[in-house]
Amino acid sequence: MNRILSVTFYLFFIYLYIYETYGKVKNTDKELSDIYGTKYYLRSGFFNSKKCKGHKYEDLQAEGEGENDKEEDSNNEEMNIDEENGLIEGQGESEDPAKASQGGLEDPAKASQGGLEDPAKASQGGLEDPAKASQGGLEDPAKASQGGLEDPAKASQGGLEDPAKASQGGLEDPAKASQGGLEDPAKASQGGLEDPAKASQGGLEDPAKASQGGLEDPAKASQGGLEDPAKASQGGAEGHGKHAPNKENKNKNKESIKNIMNMFI
């Protein structure tokens, strides 16, 4: 008999534990109980403390409202940021065009001086010392005259340490330097052109045009580039008679000058 009582006693406590842990409890909220009915809760122990899944409907609803509030707050923040950006853009567009053309400076004189108030300092590139300004910001006049280089010899050689290399235009190979930087001697003698015929024609592909000094019209070429034959025969002078050049008079003048020079000699 005692054994039966002890077994039933233990079974009763096991039943209570199972009921309290996985028991079926109705929702206490009447409005929600009509909608959702009964819900299972996961409890811990005998004190009905909710754990993990043990949330009431009103708790779930409050959590949902909290999430909605967070979303509204984030949306409001984004709207505020957009409004601030719009105001900044509006201010940038509504600024004075004259001020905008002056780099944001209100004073035109200051804007023309690169933001400097002193005109003399502005003309000296922001330097207070006129001598230093004339020397490109260098304190040593000798160094300034040498392009910022301390060694006069190096300065005279264009910044190159090797005099031979400096005399060759910075090229190490003397042959290449004498050929204008070209490796092919034939190409160098042809002015950088690969075709000898084109090189002999001054870079022109048409031999006839090359023999005419680059002019397409043979008649114009024979007249020294002048379109009027009469003007060409007069050496480019437009006038006739006493204004036209006289070759015989020129030759006579030259001979008389030579005779006078011979007399003095």
Curated annotation (Swiss-Prot):
Sequence segments annotated as region (Disordered): 59-265
Biased composition annotated in UniProt, kind: Acidic residues: 60-86
Residues spanning the signal sequence: 1-23
Annotated TM spans: none
Residue stretches of biased makeup (Basic and acidic residues): 239-257
Cellular component, GO annotation: symbiont-containing vacuole
Keywords: Malaria, Repeat, Signal
Sequence repeat copies, ranges: 97-107, 108-118, 119-129, 130-140, 141-151, 152-162, 163-173, 174-184, 185-195, 196-206, 207-217, 218-228, 229-239
Key word GTP-binding present: no
Region (13 X 11 AA approximate tandem repeats of P-A-K-A-S-Q-G-G-L-E-D): 97-239
InterPro entries (alphabetical): S-antigen
Major location (coarse): other
Top-rank taxon: Eukaryota
Statement: the UniProt record of this protein carries the keyword Lyase: no
Cellular location(s): Parasitophorous vacuole
The protein's role, per its UniProt record: S antigens are soluble heat-stable proteins present in the sera of some infected individuals.
The protein's name: S-antigen protein
Originating species: Plasmodium falciparum (isolate FC27 / Papua New Guinea)
